[in-house]
Amino acid sequence: MRPQDSTGVAELQEPGLPLTDDAPPGATEEPAAAEAAGAPDRGRCWLCLSSPCCSRTEPEAKKKAPCPGLGLFYTLLSAFLFSVGSLFVKKVQDVHAVEISAFRCVFQMLVVIPCLIYRKTGFIGPKGQRIFLILRGVLGSTAMMLIYYAYQTMSLADATVITFSSPVFTSIFAWICLKEKYSPWDALFTVFTITGVILIVRPPFLFGSDTSGMEESYSGHLKGTFAAIGSAVFAASTLVILRKMGKSVDYFLSIWYYVVLGLVESVIILSVLGEWSLPYCGLDRLFLIFIGLFGLGGQIFITKALQIEKAGPVAIMKTMDVVFAFIFQIIFFNNVPTWWTVGGALCVVASNVGAAIRKWYQSSK
């Protein structure tokens, strides 16, 4: 799922990991996707639906698609799958968001273990990169938990749009930690994103006490907002760490740390909160399986899109996450977004598209 289940896209994106240079924005769900296009080739893998494996060298990863627009189609399909996964998270109201994260970690672990064994990369990683792998795992899984909580406590469209603020934090963190340039254009996109988030949150000191269009109380809306912003911050931190590690760490090893530490973190949090519960037979258990399946499918297709298409067009097409979130909110929850939400979404999407076009233009020089 999006995170960029945050990817770690952000997280497999987590929901909402952004694409600034080499990873798509918003999706949560899935931060390791950006890394996939640059990891070393180790052989063939069934997970990627093609051969050779998704972890390929950079020159190979950018080869032309078999047919024009295939990479954009993969991106659109990925956005749809992540959005459907988010819908199922919203539907599972009787299971805590952290427990949903734990189930997804277990599901992904069952997929990653045979891949690591097949690729013979080990389960620990290079000595000098282990601290970064640990940070990537903790921050990425935290981003996933927070976005799942946001999905459960506020409208699907609002939570999705706010997670698309992640590229703003990525630019700032990269400027501070990696000494990357922070240009006036980045500052302008930051202003657009902040404006969009304010329009969605509608703080009372600016908009009064009007809460029309919110499917929950304002306190619940505010909790979801903080969770979504927190998810965007942690997803951005994860992407900066992935950039720091570069291509020295195998793609699946990065995911391995994410799912293992995410599961440990989930167990600790659930034990402290006393929120352990066995999902009811029937739809809830089916939804949990679908969350894992659609999150995995979304990650596979965003990875393949980044292999055969430039990052800029992928980032622009990835904004379809927001469109699907609006459609699902109207169809499945009978909740028509307000004009404030639409205006906020346009500001955030415009910021993401502008940043993607600028990066695309710079890379084509």
Swiss-Prot record:
Protein name per UniProt: Solute carrier family 35 member G1
The encoding gene: SLC35G1
Organism this protein belongs to: Homo sapiens (Human)
One GO term of the biological process aspect: calcium ion export across plasma membrane
UniProt topology in membrane: Multi-pass membrane protein
Self-association and partners: Interacts with STIM1; stimulated by depletion of intracellular calcium. Interacts with ORAI1. Interacts with the plasma membrane calcium-transporting ATPases ATP2B1 and ATP2B4. Interacts with ATP1A1, ATP2A2, KPNB1 and XPO1.
Compositionally biased tracts (Low complexity): 23-33
Tissue expression per record: Ubiquitously expressed.
Entry keywords, A to Z: Cell membrane, Endoplasmic reticulum, Membrane, Repeat, Transmembrane, Transmembrane helix
One GO CC term on file: plasma membrane
Location within or outside the cell: Cell membrane; Endoplasmic reticulum membrane
Protein purpose: May play a role in intracellular calcium sensing and homeostasis. May act as a negative regulator of plasma membrane calcium-transporting ATPases preventing calcium efflux from the cell.
UniProt xrefs under PANTHER family: ACYL-MALONYL CONDENSING ENZYME-RELATED, SOLUTE CARRIER FAMILY 35 MEMBER G1
Pfam families documented for this protein: EamA
Region (Disordered): 1-33
Entry's family note: Belongs to the TMEM20 family.
Record has Disulfide bond as a keyword: no
Record field: transmembrane: 69-89, 97-117, 131-151, 156-176, 187-207, 222-242, 252-272, 286-306, 311-333, 338-357
Domain EamA positions: 80-202, 233-357
Domain of life: Eukaryota
